[in-house]
């Protein structure tokens, strides 16, 4: 029987596509705004939400989403204060989330196997509820980036110019930080906390080899991201190795191949 006939593998393929679309769009904004470190801080802070969910006995995804959104808003708020640097704010929420997660998982009654699944992920365990979450966020991202692409690009590359055009920069920054937090949480089941930031950066860095256009970079990120997911699934199935690590490994291989190809392409053709 073909592996494609199994429901869990069909869910993995659909989840990969939805995650590639979502991460392709949001990740392009992250890379353009140079928010990779902040996104990494939010990712690690989500451990606190997962630990709270495990300890209280309800969905770790919901608690991680709430905790990550609050952490994102907290980092954004502290980053705009003159008495605290951005990297210091990230470190505070990063370590706060990790400490809360460790304490809650230690105090949780019984064995907590769910915690390790969120740390390392397994795309083959993606559930229909995970697909609904990914699909909803991907649809919202498509609508937002289609309708508000020019303002988002303006704010991503030159926030001061955007302010001079009377664009609501602060409001949009908070909303995008919350969107980043939800995107991270939605992808935890696929690759886990340890590797989720890679889905939001490696395809974008690969796309950036060939173009500096925000729109083309987002589209190429979706293609390279999905290619990495498919290749990772293939390796995971045939060699019985963790799917999350396989996806990231293949994504990095794609980056290296594209980097090699770019050396033979004149710079003016990549603009």
Q: For each of these PLM feature ranges, what is it?
A:
Residues 1-21, 270:
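Membrane-interfacial amphipathic/re-entrant helices at transmembrane-helix boundaries
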Residues 13-18, 61-66, 91-92, 131-136, ...:
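Hydrophobic alpha-helical transmembrane segments
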Residues 28-111, 207-219, 236-239, 263-264:
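Short loop segments and helix-boundary regions at transmembrane helix junctions
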Residues 241-248, 252-271:
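Cytosolic-side transmembrane-helix boundaries in multi-pass membrane proteins
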């Amino acid at each position: 029987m073909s592996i494609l006939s199994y429901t869990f593998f069909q869910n993995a393929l659909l989840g990969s596509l939805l995650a590639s679309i979502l991460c392709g769009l949001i990740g392009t904004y992250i890379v353009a705004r140079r928010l990779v470190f902040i996104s990494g801080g939010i990712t690690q802070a989500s451990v606190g939400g997962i630990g709270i969910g495990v300890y209280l006995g309800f969905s770790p995804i919901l608690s991680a989403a709430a905790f990550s959104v609050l952490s994102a808003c907290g980092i954004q708020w502290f980053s705009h204060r003159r008495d605290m640097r951005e990297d210091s704010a990230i470190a505070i929420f990063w370590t706060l989330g990790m400490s809360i997660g460790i304490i809650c998982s230690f105090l949780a009654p019984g064995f907590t196997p769910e915690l390790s699944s969120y740390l390392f992920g397994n795309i083959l365990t993606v559930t229909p509820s995970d697909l609904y979450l990914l699909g909803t966020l991907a649809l919202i991202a498509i609508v937002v980036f289609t309708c508000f692409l020019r303002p988002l690009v303006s704010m991503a590359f030159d926030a001061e110019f955007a302010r001079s055009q009377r664009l609501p920069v602060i409001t949009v920054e908070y909303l995008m930080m919350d969107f980043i937090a939800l995107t991270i949480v939605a992808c935890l089941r696929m690759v886990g906390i340890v590797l989720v930031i890679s889905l939001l950066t490696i395809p974008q860095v690969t796309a950036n080899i060939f173009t500096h256009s925000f729109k083309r970079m987002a589209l190429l990120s979706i293609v390279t991201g999905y290619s990495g997911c498919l290749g990772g699934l293939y390796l995971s199935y045939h060699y019985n190795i963790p799917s999350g690590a396989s996806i990231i490994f293949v994504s990095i291989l794609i980056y290296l191949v594209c980097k090699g190809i770019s050396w033979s392409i004149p710079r003016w053709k990549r603009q």
